[in-house]
Swiss-Prot record:
Its EC number is 1.1.1.-. This is Aldo-keto reductase yakc [NADP(+)]. SUPFAM superfamilies: NAD(P)-linked oxidoreductase. The record marks K83 as: Lowers pKa of active site Tyr. InterPro entries: Aldo-Keto_reductase (IPR050791), NADP_OxRdtase_dom (IPR023210), NADP_OxRdtase_dom_sf (IPR036812). GO terms for molecular function: aldo-keto reductase (NADPH) activity; oxidoreductase activity, acting on CH-OH group of donors. The keyword Oxidoreductase applies. The gene is yakc. NADP(+) binds at A208, P209, L210, G211, R212, G213, F214, L215, T216, G217, A218. Monomer.
Length: 340
C-alpha cells in the first residue's frame, strides 16, 4: 500500500506522524532501549514525520532522537519537527516563556547540538509569552531559515490573529493544535484557527488526536491513569468530569465495532476525513499501539460514518478544561502589536 501523504511546505510527509513527547514527558517513565526500539519501528513502518520539543524531558527527547540518528545513520529518512519557547531557570528550575529573537537563536543552537544535526526540518514556536510581537518572532525565524538552520516555520496554540500576522511576514508551514473528536475548539467561529490556517494554506498538525488516549476506550475510570500521569491533573479527566466525557467514547467504540476497527483508528480516520490539510501526530511508547495508529491510514470511512461521528461530537458535552489551571491560559495566545 502506498502511504497517504500530507504537505508541509514543499515537502510530502506521511498523513499520520509520530508524537515523541510521551517517551520523556507527561505519561511516566520509559527505558532508553524501549524508546530506541519504537523510533526504529516507526521509521521501518514509514511513519517518518516525527515531532519533538526542547521541553520534552528538558532536552532528553531531542538527545534520544539524536542518539537514534547517530546509531542508525537514518537521519535523511526522517522529517523532524521540534519546538522552542520554554526557558528553564537553571537555579530554581522554574519555567517561563521566552520568544525574544536572541533566545530563539540560542534555543535553536542547543536543539541542533542535542540532535547532532545541522538543520531542523520544521521549527515551531511551542507557546507564546504574549510579550513579543509575532512580527519580531517571524523575523528572527526567517533569519534562521536563511542561515540554513531550519527549513520551515511552525506555530503552536496561537490565535487566528497571530496566524494571519505571522503569515504576512513569512510563510507559516504548520500550526500545531489539539484537535480530535474530543477537542473541536479550532473549528469554532469565535476562535477561528482552522479558518485562518486554511486562508493561508497552512497544514494543521493535530496533537493529542486521541484525546490523550481517552478515545481509545482503554480508560474506564480516572484510577486507570498511572501515578504521576498528566491526566491525573487535567480537569477533563477528573472524577467529576470523567464519566460524563466517557459517553462520547462509548459512542465512538460502538461505531468502531460496526466498522471492524479500533476506536483509536476510527478517531484518526475521522480526523483525516476533515481535510487534506489535517495531519494527526499520535504518540505512544509501545510498538503495538504505533502499528495500530499508523494502520488508520488504511481505513476509509463512508460519508455516513463520518457524519455519524460528527453528530456524536455535536451531541456530546465535553466538560473540563484541557490543561490544569495556569497552563491553559497559554492556549490560542495573541501577541502584542509592533511598536510604532
Amino acid at each position: 500500500m502506498s502511504i497517504p501523504t500530507r504537505k508541509i511546505g514543499n515537502d510530502t510527509v506521511p498523513a499520520i506522524g509520530f508524537g515523541c513527547m510521551g517517551l520523556h514527558a507527561m505519561y511516566g517513565p520509559s527505558s532508553e532501549e524501549a524508546n530506541q526500539a519504537v523510533l526504529t519501528h516507526a521509521a521501518d513502518l514509514g511513519c517518518t514525520f516525527w515531532d519533538s520539543s526542547d521541553m520534552y524531558g528538558f532536552g532528553a527527547n531531542e538527545e534520544c532522537i539524536g542518539r537514534w540518528f547517530k546509531q542508525t545513520g537514518r537521519r535523511k529518512e526522517i522529517f523532524l519537527a521540534t519546538k522552542f519557547g520554554y526557558e528553564k531557570n537553571p537555579e530554581t528550575g522554574e519555567l517561563s516563556l521566552n520568544n525574544e529573537p536572541d533566545y530563539i537563536e540560542k534555543a535553536l543552537d542547543l536543539s541542533l547540538k542535542r540532535l547532532g544535526i545541522d538543520c531542523i526540518d520544521l521549527y515551531y514556536v511551542h507557546r507564546f509569552s504574549g510579550e513579543t510581537p509575532i512580527e519580531k518572532i517571524m523575523g528572527a525565524l526567517k533569519k534562521c531559515v536563511e542561515a540554513g538552520k531550519i527549513r520551515y516555520i511552525g506555530l503552536s496554540e496561537c490565535s487566528a490573529n497571530t496566524i494571519r500576522r505571522a503569515a504576512a511576514v513569512y510563510p507559516v508551514s504548520a500550526v500545531q493544535v489539539e484537535y480530535s473528536p474530543f477537542s473541536l475548539e479550532i473549528e469554532r467561529p469565535e476562535i477561528g484557527v482552522m479558518k485562518a490556517c486554511r486562508e493561508n494554506n497552512i497544514t494543521i498538525v493535530c496533537y493529542a488526536p486521541l484525546g490523550r488516549g481517552f478515545l481509545t476506550g482503554a480508560y474506564k475510570s480516572p484510577d486507570d491513569f498511572p501515578e504521576g500521569d498528566f491526566r491525573r491533573k487535567a480537569p477533563r479527566y477528573q472524577k467529576e468530569n470523567f464519566y460524563k466525557n466517557l459517553e462520547l467514547v462509548t459512542k465512538i467504540e460502538k461505531i468502531a465495532t460496526a466498522n471492524n476497527i479500533t476506536p483509536g483508528q476510527l478517531s484518526l480516520a475521522w480526523l483525516l476525513a476533515q481535510g487534506d490539510d489535517i495531519l494527526p501526530i499520535p504518540g505512544t511508547k509501545r510498538v503495538k499501539y504505533l502499528e495500530e495508529n499508523f494502520g488508520a491510514l488504511k481505513v476509509k470511512l463512508s460519508d455516513a460514518t463520518v457524519k455519524e461521528i460528527r453528530e456524536a461530537c455535536d451531541n456530546a458535552e465535553v466538560i473540563g478544561a484541557r490543561y490544569p489551571p495556569g497552563a491553559g491560559s497559554k492556549i490560542f495566545m495573541d501577541t502584542p502589536p509592533m511598536p510604532k
